[in-house]
């Protein structure tokens, strides 16, 4: 299903081919959560990404956008070296800035996975410097039911093919 040329919708029920030997985490995520997964092409321009978000917000009556960064590139200042995928993260953050929703959140999962040369405390300090931006810091506990669910789902999404998920 592709209701707009700027994004795709993945619903595991619509995929009939055997995908066992293919890296397709969106399929597994859709299957495990029982929901549609929206994919915006990583080769898209900022305007195409913004159009995709605007269309999804309107089409699904979205009131909150929650971006999730695997790692912490979205928290960096640009002065760091050996970055992972900061361009992709920054493009999505910029595109979402202009979207009219009541709440916008970004979460960094696996904060020290790709930014290990910069201490986590330094990143948190930077966020505290900017008023009203840091909502919460949370260290995951494997006994927490939601953390267990995360591990369960992402293990099925073939985390060995994702640097961040394999390190979390």
Regions found by a protein language model. Name each.
Residues 94-111:
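Short, flexible loop segments at boundaries between secondary-structure elements
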Residues 33-96:
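Internal, conserved structured core segments that host functional sites
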Residues 1-37:
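Glycine-rich nucleotide/cofactor/substrate-binding loop typically near the N-terminus or early
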Residues 33, 37, 57-60, 96-100, ...:
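Structural signal for hydrophobic packing residues in well-ordered secondary-structure cores
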Residues 123-168:
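A conserved mid-domain beta-alpha-beta active-site/ligand-binding segment of alpha/beta enzyme cores
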Residues 82-83, 121-125:
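Short, solvent-exposed amphipathic alpha-helical segments in soluble enzyme
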Residues 18, 22, 26, 46-49, ...:
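Generic structural signal for well-ordered, non-membrane alpha-helical segments
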Residues 106-108, 112-123:
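Glycine-rich, charge-decorated loop segments at or immediately adjacent to ligand/cofactor-binding or catalytic sites
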């Amino acid at each position: 299903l592709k209701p707009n040329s700027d994004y795709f919708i993945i619903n595991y029920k619509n995929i009939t081919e055997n995908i066992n030997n293919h890296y397709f985490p969106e399929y597994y995520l859709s299957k495990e959560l029982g929901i549609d997964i929206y994919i915006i092409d990583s080769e898209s321009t900022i305007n195409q990404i913004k159009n995709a978000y605007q269309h999804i917000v309107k089409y699904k009556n979205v009131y909150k956008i929650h971006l999730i960064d695997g790692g912490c590139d979205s928290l960096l200042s640009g002065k760091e070296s050996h970055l992972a995928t900061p361009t992709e993260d920054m493009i999505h953050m910029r595109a979402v800035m202009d979207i009219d929703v009541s709440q916008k959140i970004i979460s960094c999962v696996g904060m020290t996975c790709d930014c290990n040369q910069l201490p986590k405390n330094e990143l948190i300090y930077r966020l505290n410097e900017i008023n009203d931006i840091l909502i919460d810091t949370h260290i995951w506990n494997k006994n927490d039911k939601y953390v267990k669910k995360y591990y369960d789902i992402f293990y099925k999404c073939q985390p060995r093919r994702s640097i961040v998920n394999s390190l979390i």
